[in-house]
Amino acid sequence: MLALRKTLLHGRLPAAPPAAAAAAIASRIPALLRRLSSSPGDGQGGDEWGSSWSTGITKEHFDGSDAAVGRPVTSPSKPVSPELAAVRAMDEEDEIFRAMERDNREAKAYVDSWGDRMRETCELLKQVREPGSRGSYLKDSEKQEMYRLHKEDPETYTVERLAKDFRVMRQRVHAILWLKEMEEEEERKLGKPLDDSVEVLLDSCPEFFNSHDREFHVASLPYKPDFKVMPEGWDGTTRDPDEVLYEISMKEDQMLYEEFVQRLQFNKKKVAGEVKCHKYSRRRPDDGWTYMVEKLGAQSKRGSGGGWKFASLPDGSSRPLNDMEKMYVKRETPKRRRRIMAPFK
């Protein structure tokens, strides 16, 4: 095969066999065909060619007038010119180049698509581990409707109901209501509506953002074995892991919600100027400071397990703590739990 390929490329064929050798080969062909034949001839020295089909070889194969089965064979009597050989070589090279270019295009498209594949995989894994992270955008028109309903009937449209109706977290409802309240106060001061061109643009092009869909907190549990000594007579049944995860998630969500409300109330008072944070604004009053005193309990305990707190006035009298002071005390109370952090944040 290698010699034939070199022959086709260079246009040179081997020399024809001598005439004597060709005559000897031709004289042996009838005897060979007679052996290959499955049935004898007619007794007159003739050969029956029809039965030789069982061998897959016909007379034309030996005469050189028929091509081999399934592949063309170039006759030695037709020499290949150098021009034809060069054209065939160029065609083969062009075919190789076209195959290489096609493979390069396919490989480049495959490599370029890896960025989108990785982003899609990251989003899918994020939804699997924390399904509540899908809620990422809420239209301004929906925020306006939320604030209008709460302002008209706050007892009916509570924070819990608005969070359930609009399928968002309660923390977002608190933030949206406070934001719309501040915008309404600012419009009242300016005497004209605020510029809402950005909000209108976002509402008119929602395809650029992910729609909100049932925000909720999902706890991140440690993946490690938990060995327990079960009581005698235990039937071998355990709780569903999804049920345990749901209960823990609800407890953590309630704790996060309470902390958010406390911080939001503090920020509201801070924005209103009721909380003084600057060091030069905390000057000693003319009549003296008011101190908070904590009385220890029976077993010298502090906090909820011990005594109680009250305010000591400069004149020596005392009074219970007001709402502002209670808020300060609650913010200073340490939270005896691990820090709750949402994954992928």
Swiss-Prot record:
One of its GO terms (cellular component) is mitochondrion. It is found in: Mitochondrion. One of its GO terms (biological process) is endosperm development. Residues 36-81 are annotated as: Disordered. Its main location: mitochondrion. Disruption phenotype: Normal vegetative and floral organ development, but several defects in reproductive organs such as reduced pollen production due to abnormal microspore development, aborted seeds, reduced endosperm nuclei divisions, abnormal distribution of free nuclei missing an oriented positioning at the micropylar end of embryo sacs, and interrupted aleurone differentiation associated with unusual positional endosperm cell differentiation. Residues 1-43 form a transit peptide. Expressed in roots, stems, leaves and florets. The keyword Ribonucleoprotein does not apply. Keywords: Developmental protein, Mitochondrion, Transit peptide. Pfam families: MRP-L20 (PF12824). Essential for fertility (male and female gametophyte functions and development). Required for the integrity of female gametic mitochondria. Involved in embryo apical-basal patterning, and particularly dorsal-ventral patterning, during early embryogenesis, and endosperm free nucleus positioning and development as well as early endosperm development, probably by modulating the expression pattern of related genes (e.g. AL1, MYB3/AL2, CYP78A13/GE, PNH1, HAZ1, MPK6 and OSH1). This is Protein GAMETE CELL DEFECTIVE 1, mitochondrial. It comes from Oryza sativa subsp. japonica (Rice). The lineage of its organism: Eukaryota, Viridiplantae, Streptophyta, Embryophyta, Tracheophyta.
